Amino acid sequence: MRRHPQTATKHLFVSGGVASSLGKGLTASSLGQLLTARGLRVTMQKLDPYLNVDPGTMNPFQHGEVFVTEDGAETDLDVGHYERFLDRDLSGSANVTTGQVYSTVIAKERRGEYLGDTVQVIPHITDEIKRRIMAMAEPNADGRRPDVVITEIGGTVGDIESQPFLEAARQVRHDLGRENVFFLHVSLVPYLAPSGELKTKPTQHSVAALRSIGITPDALILRCDRDVPEALKNKIALMCDVDIDGIISTPAAPSIYDIPKVLHREELDAFVVRRLNLPFRDVDWTEWDDLLRRVHEPKETVRIALVGKYVELSDAYLSVIEAIRAGGFKHRAKVEISWVGSDDCQTDGGVASALGDVHGVLIPGGFGIRGIEGKISAISYARSRGLPVFGLCLGLQCIVIEAARSVGLTEANSAEFEPGTPDPVISTMADQEHIVSGQADLGGTMRLGAYPAVLESGSIVAEAYQSTKVSERHRHRYEVNNAYRERIAESGLRFSGTSPDGHLVEFVEYPPEQHPFVVGTQAHPELKSRPTRPHPLFAAFVKAAIDYKEGELLPVEMPERVSNGAERRDQVGQSIPEPANRG
């Protein structure tokens, strides 16, 4: 009798059917959080069926944000959910794309590694997918293997692009044995208002499509706008050949942080550990219950304006939004996001209308010239009113440009936006010049991943971190031009953090006596924030917004400027009146 090899690591695959955007990533993340709270070591992976090697060159409006890991991989935004819910760092191997798989297989064929075989989807493509899935079960740096690998299969069952990944997952179950692999399928149960009915047929057809390729799900997540009655659960269990204990109803939750509670109430985690014969303890809710109290019982509310280029799609700033909210949780505050298109801030009237009733301004990262003057105008407006400002990556660069213009460098700009500017206060990094000039690939070639920085003792950022040595993740090609540091410093802007060799500017800020909180970082600290462990810079920013709301700070006297930084001499020294409503 054939015996499957013993494996210490179990594999759980999450697929989706009927429609996209059903929340597979959040479902997988929440289940991972539950298993972790039961004392299991969990890691996660996303299989993306698109042909791009990674999302680094994709339009944010199509894909959403690019999540950068510690080791510098540009990955899917779901990897950010995984890190936040598991509260652990993942590597680039947590995201696999069709582009990566085909690139590897074709490279092997060119090297002759297939010994003249005809290279095909099965077995060569599926074998490479399986290799990457199985690699997640390898021991970590401490020599410990994960107890469970949760792998989310992107796309929808029936999509031609997803078929090789589903086939590879089927083969993993065949290779490791059914007792070591669990399939969880997320499906839609629509409600038809005219007839007042919940319809199960789409789920039945989705499971039938899954079974046609050899996969029988062990459990079904039923997405619906209401609880699915027991009678319908029994019907779905019968028609889809799934144990009734594996039929999980998941109506819309009050927040994404409530999803683990929803799944636990339906006993999904208990069903999984029993089916996979995993050792476990009862769920430890101590940390998560404290988070939920902070989410649902805030003591105050602040409004933060996010001035960005891609505000029509909130997923383009997913980690930023989660980090701001987590910063609010730290202070038992609810953060309301005011979405402000940077194009709308290019005029005095536009910026006043957009920012007149907020308590803080966040300038996120981005690329290209569109909307840049609006971001700079937003910084000038906030500076003149003592309004807290936090700049990320491009946000730091805009703070520097605004500061340079305030000391007479009226044409100061970035080489990215205006290559011919006489004052390129933001310049191309030396090792990026050949890439920007088109002599090398754009994809995967930025300054990516974790880099250290040294902070000035006593600075706002050092006080926030409670340390003068930090490490943050990066994604950029441009840097502050060191030739302009002294001139920019005349504005009062301090270069409060640099790379260890002092060459790269990593953090800037105005001293508190000049402005309560204007801080910029070349990094992306939002990528390291966790709901249970808010990033210190976001916590400090939200605290500054709370202080602004409560403190009735007086406006700072500054000359009013036109968009290119030139002063209006007839109004120099006049303070700009405080907005009537801080609300």
Curated annotation (Swiss-Prot):
Its EC number is 6.3.4.2. Pathway: Pyrimidine metabolism; CTP biosynthesis via de novo pathway; CTP from UDP: step 2/2. Mg(2+) binds at D78, E152. The active site is at C393 (nucleophile), H524, E526. Residues 559-583 are annotated as: Disordered. One of its GO terms (biological process) is 'de novo' CTP biosynthetic process. GO terms for molecular function: ATP binding; CTP synthase activity; glutaminase activity; identical protein binding; metal ion binding. GO terms for cellular component: cytosol. CTP binds at S20, D159, I160, E161, K199, T200, K201, P202, T203, Q204, K235. It catalyses: UTP + L-glutamine + ATP + H2O = CTP + L-glutamate + ADP + phosphate + 2 H(+); L-glutamine + H2O = L-glutamate + NH4(+); UTP + NH4(+) + ATP = CTP + ADP + phosphate + 2 H(+). Pfam families: CTP_synth_N, GATase. PROSITE patterns: GATASE_TYPE_1. ATP binds at S21, L22, G23, K24, G25, L26, D78. UTP binds at S20, K199, T200, K201, P202, T203, Q204, K235. Allosterically activated by GTP, when glutamine is the substrate; GTP has no effect on the reaction when ammonia is the substrate. The allosteric effector GTP functions by stabilizing the protein conformation that binds the tetrahedral intermediate(s) formed during glutamine hydrolysis. Inhibited by the product CTP, via allosteric rather than competitive inhibition. Residues 303-551 form the Glutamine amidotransferase type-1 domain. CTPSs have evolved a hybrid strategy for distinguishing between UTP and CTP. The overlapping regions of the product feedback inhibitory and substrate sites recognize a common feature in both compounds, the triphosphate moiety. To differentiate isosteric substrate and product pyrimidine rings, an additional pocket far from the expected kinase/ligase catalytic site, specifically recognizes the cytosine and ribose portions of the product inhibitor. Homotetramer. Catalyzes the ATP-dependent amination of UTP to CTP with either L-glutamine or ammonia as the source of nitrogen. Regulates intracellular CTP levels through interactions with the four ribonucleotide triphosphates. Belongs to the CTP synthase family. NCBIfam families: PRK05380.1 (NF003792), PyrG (TIGR00337). This is CTP synthase. It comes from Mycobacterium ulcerans (strain Agy99).
